[in-house]
Every structure is written in structure tokens, then in C-alpha cells.
Amino acid sequence: MNNQKYIRNFSIIAHIDHGKSTLADRLIEHCGGLQAREMSQQVLDSMDIEKERGITIKAQTVRLVYKAKDGNTYYLNLMDTPGHVDFAYEVSRSLAACEGSLLVVDSTQGVEAQTLANVYQAIENDHEIVPVLNKIDLPASEPEQVKQQIKDIIGIDASEAVLISAKSGIGIDLVLEAIVNKLPPPKESSSDILKALLVDSWYDPYLGVVILVRIIDGTLRKNIRIKMMATNSVYTVENVGYFTPKKHISDVLHAGEIGFFTASIKQVADCKVGDTITDEKKPCEQALPGFKPNLPVVFCGLYPTDSAEFEHLKDSLAKLRLNDASFEYEMESSSALGVGFRCGFLGLLHLEIIQERLSREFDLDLITTAPSVVYKIHMRDGESLEIHNPADLSDLQKIESMEEPWIKATIMVPDEFLGAVLSLCTEKRGVQLDHSYIANRAKIIYKLPLNEIVYDFYDRLKSCSKGYASFEWQMDVYEPSELVKLGILVNGEEVDALSTIVHRSRAEQRGRALCVRLKDLIPRQQIDIAIQASIGSRIIARETIKALRKDVLSKCYGGDISRKRKLLEKQKAGKKRMRQYGNIEIPQSAFIAALKIGDE
């Protein structure tokens, strides 16, 4: 298949739960990509965790063959993209490989915050956008109102939006006709020299690294020698093919097509997402612009509960890193938890997903330290540092100032919940930038410190709006702030794994909460245990776990008082010695519970 005018590369963009994976299922079913008995819900959500949570995490690709009403056969390459703000990087990669997008909006809920974020990315990529209104068979559906919303908020004419119900299959043929008639084909190939964009890569235990590519110019064939332009690595192509969504071997991919190839690549580092792949013998002169890499914004430590599992954790992280280019890690050690890894994530959902995948796919039992963000530290000697681990915060006397990251958040909420949402944003040190109404929904834009978001903001936002608020954010600026390191001491010894960096106004509240929680979690011992929260050398909160008292007089039935006194003195001396030399063992379960996110 060489004629590019019969190819359409498109992605589906939508907010979570607006039905894009269901629409993808219907398109596959309609085009005969899978037989009826092979169909399952959310075909393209390959991970169990995606199906259980009802979210798309990894962008997936599928080639559909469609016989249009004009009599021609078209080849449609669909990129199913995630909707959650944490996985915007996956969306950006999918959009770069396509020329058009289907904008799916739930006709019962209207435009949501994350719909906006993804649409703006599509517009930046010069996409032709076709609005699709889903769930029109529900009683609460308001298609005319939602069309007006799309026009008012996004600025796209939605008067000819396709009305569908992905669940019951209404209007699927109209969507396919809109893809063929309204979305543009790939640009004509300007050269015969191979130039391909590396869109994604994942690890297959039998084939090694499988690479997903969009061919821009030339052809990719079996047995040719290719070069990765970012790393200058050279490989021989072994298999070439595409997904329907089953794997199909085709031996060649032409310009404009999206497919995969394998080349016995074992090195994870050689597959840089956004890299340009070219022919080793006739390389192209200029690499493709690639993608702007997404930098991690939330960091935490991952430690195995059993130190013998460290090597297993190391291998597991290396394999996950291949499937997830936005996830970073480096080795670190903690006096309380042993050797582990400091990991960087795009957000809290991303952190949870990685944790759950390590647990399910690699059978690892992990301890996760409290999440933190990247702070900029300006020292008195003129040096500037970036730290994300509170344990790295050195002598406070040498620090001139500290800056924390602020985000620009867009929140859309029904007006009856607006008061509760505004109170939450104010409590989190937010600054209101804009406030507008679209029908009965409020759109508010706030500037918020990222430090406040990573704990429990998302859960509390959903809670105070009964699940109706939607939230999207992007990094804004770094600003000076009164930040302090909150340390936790158990019997005078600082526990590095429980240290956090907080705003001075929140330090006492958070310190007290941690002390109370640890008091409930650490088992009583033979001596009193002091749990203290400190800022530098100043103690700001304290809780005491009272000692267990062994009854040494239980065997004295009456008798001389001096005998009893002697036993009590002996016990007192033993406890004094224990206080002097005894180490308090904090059980792993106490750490896990104390570090639980969102229990503040």
C-alpha cells in the first residue's frame, strides 16, 4: 500500500470516562479488526490495571481497514491516548504521529478541564479536529448545550459534530465517514531516504525491544541496517509489522504508515522516544524535531521490604523504564530503610500506577516514602542547588533562600460546589487568577504550590465536589517561599525516611499529625518512647508512647517490703540501662502506614 491519500492517522482525545476506549472498541469491531468472540471491553487497554481503573495509561496503536461509501478502501491508523493529566506525555507522542484528532465529549457532562489540555496540544500539532458527542442515548444528554460549550470554550465549530453512543454502537459509521472525509492524509513523502519517528518502545521477553514508529519518508524493510540518530546505534531490522490490534508481520512499512519493528535491541538506553531512525547506508541529513521531554515533578523513595529483593527491584525498574520514558530513578540509601531508589514521576496517579505495576507484574513488596517536589536552594556562598530529597537539605544556616514550584490549575466545577472548591484552594495557599461561568459550570484558574497538590488535593477536590469537579494543571514558575525541613525523631534519633519539606505555616500541624500517627503505629516497649517533630534544633511537637510495665512483684505473696523494693530498684536500673543503649525498632508496617499518601 503506497498511495498515501488512502491513509488516515488519527488519535482520540477526551477526558477520563468520556468513552474513548469504548469508541475505539466499536471502531475495531466495525472494521473487523477482531472477530466478535475475540472482542472484550477496552480492547486497547492491555494492562489489567487499565481495565480495573477504567483509565488508559499507555497509548496504543491499531490499523483498521475501512471500505468507505465512496467505494475506496482506506487504512486508518488509530492512536488511543490516555486522558489523565499525568499521562499528557503519552498524549503528546501520539499526537505527533498523527494529522487529525477525534475530540470525544460526554454529552451528559460537557467539556472538562483535561479535555481542554489535550485539545490545545492537538491544535499545537496543527491537527484537524472532528468533535464527537458521546452517550447521546442517555436521558441526561444535552447535545445542543455541549456543542455551544465546545464553541465557547475551545473555539471549534461543533455544529456538525458527530452524535454517537459508543456503548450501543449508534453513529459509528458516521464517525468512520468523518475520519475519511474531514481528516487529512499524511503529507506527501519528500524523499526516498528513510526517516522515521520513534513514537514508543516496550520490552518483549522473546523479541527484546519492540519499537513503534511513524514513517515520515522512505520505507522501512526487513533486513536493512538502521541507525538511531540520537545515540548513533546501528541495528539490523528483523521483523516489521503493524497491529490490528493483533500483531501482523508485513516485511515493509511505507511513508505515512504507523507500525512496529524489532531488531534484537537489548539496551533500554538506545530507544530514546522522539528519536529519528534512518538508513545506515543512506542517512537523512536532519533529524526530526522529536518531543519536548516531560520532566518528573513528584519524587519519592521506593525500598524493598526485604533487602534481598534489591536486585529484583533494580531489574524491574529497568524494564518499566523502557515502557515508560517519563519515569526516572537513581539509587539511594536510607539509614532507616536500607538501599532503594529515588524515583521521579509526572504526578501522583503516575506514582500509584508504577507502584501497582511493580507489585503486580514483578511481585514486589515495597515501601514508598512521602512524595516531594523539586526545590531550588540558593546558598549564602552564591551556589544554587536543586533538591527533591529532604535528606539532602544540609545546614539551614548556609541557606540564603528557597524556592518552590507553583502550578497553574484549571478547575471546572458545577456552581453548587464552587464554594467548597474555592475554600479548598485557599486552604492550599492558592491565588485566584480567573473566574468565569459557562452555562451552569464555573471555570476557575488558580495558582497553587505543587507541594500542597502532591498530598491529598485531588482526593479532597473530588470529595468536596461529589466527583463532579475536573482538574488540569501545568508547571508555572518557581517563587521564593518560607520552607522548612520537618524532621521526625524517635528517642532522639532522626528517622530520615520520614523527613519532609513543608511551608513554615503548615509545619506544626503536619508535625503533630505525624507524631500522633506514629504513636498509634509503633508498638509499646519496655521503656518510654519519645516521638518528636523538629525544625532544625527546635522541637515543635511531641508524643510519648508509655512503657510496658512488667510486674516484677507478681511472685511476692506478702512478705518483707524491702524484698519488693529491691526488685523494683533492680527493674529501674535495667530500664535506665535500656534507655541508654537500647535501639527502638520501628516495624515496617509502621513506616508503610505513616507514609501513606493522603492520610494527612
UniProtKB/Swiss-Prot annotation:
Pfam families named in the record: EFG_C, GTP_EFTU, GTP_EFTU_D2, LepA_C
What EC number(s) is this enzyme filed under? Answer: 3.6.5.n1
Listed binding positions for GTP are D17, H18, G19, K20, S21, T22, N134, K135, I136, D137
Which cellular compartments is it found in?
Cell inner membrane
Q: Which reaction does it catalyse?
A: GTP + H2O = GDP + phosphate + H(+)
The protein's UniProt keywords, in alphabetical order, are: Cell inner membrane, Cell membrane, GTP-binding, Hydrolase, Membrane, Nucleotide-binding, Protein biosynthesis
Tell me which GO cellular component terms the UniProt record holds: plasma membrane
| Similarity comment text for this entry | Belongs to the TRAFAC class translation factor GTPase superfamily. Classic translation factor GTPase family. LepA subfamily.
Q: Which PANTHER family match?
A: TRANSLATION FACTOR GUF1 HOMOLOG, CHLOROPLASTIC, TRANSLATION FACTOR GUF1-RELATED
Q: What is this protein called?
A: Elongation factor 4
- As recorded in Swiss-Prot or TrEMBL, the protein's gene is named lepA
